[in-house]
């Protein structure tokens, strides 16, 4: 089951800078789509993009 409420088509936009394909929600957990910047550590609670850099502002 996907905890992210979004369709599986379109473009997902996480915050102001993150984008990924195959979903169309405004906030994305890692189970929805890989929105985090490349190399960003995935958080246990799911990753939510909040910026371009891989730091504490990336995940919540």
Swiss-Prot record:
- Keyword Metal-binding on entry: yes
Q: Which residues bind a divalent metal cation 2?
A: 6, 12, 14, 25
> Mind listing the GO molecular function terms for this protein?
metal ion binding
Show the InterPro entries listed in the entry: Metalthion_dom_sf, Metalthion_dom_sf_vert, Metalthion_vert, Metalthion_vert_metal_BS
Q: Which residues are a divalent metal cation 3-binding?
A: 14, 18, 23, 28
UniProt-listed Pfam families: Metallothio (PF00131)
**Residues engaged in binding a divalent metal cation 1:** 4, 6, 20, 23
- Residues annotated to bind a divalent metal cation 6: 36, 40, 43, 59
Question: Which residues does a divalent metal cation 7 bind?
Answer: 49, 54, 58-59
Residues noted as binding a divalent metal cation 4 in the record, renumbered to the chain: 32-33, 43, 47
Annotated region (Alpha) at 29-60
Which family is it part of?
Belongs to the metallothionein superfamily. Type 1 family.
- Function, as annotated: Metallothioneins have a high content of cysteine residues that bind various heavy metals.
State what protein this is by name.
Metallothionein A
Gene label = mta
């Amino acid at each position: 089951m996907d905890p992210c409420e979004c369709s599986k088509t379109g473009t997902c936009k996480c915050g102001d800078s993150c984008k990924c394909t195959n979903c169309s929600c405004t906030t994305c957990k890692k189970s929805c789509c890989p929105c985090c910047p490349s190399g960003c550590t995935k958080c246990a609670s799911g990753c939510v993009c909040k910026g371009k850099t891989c730091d504490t502002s990336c995940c919540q």
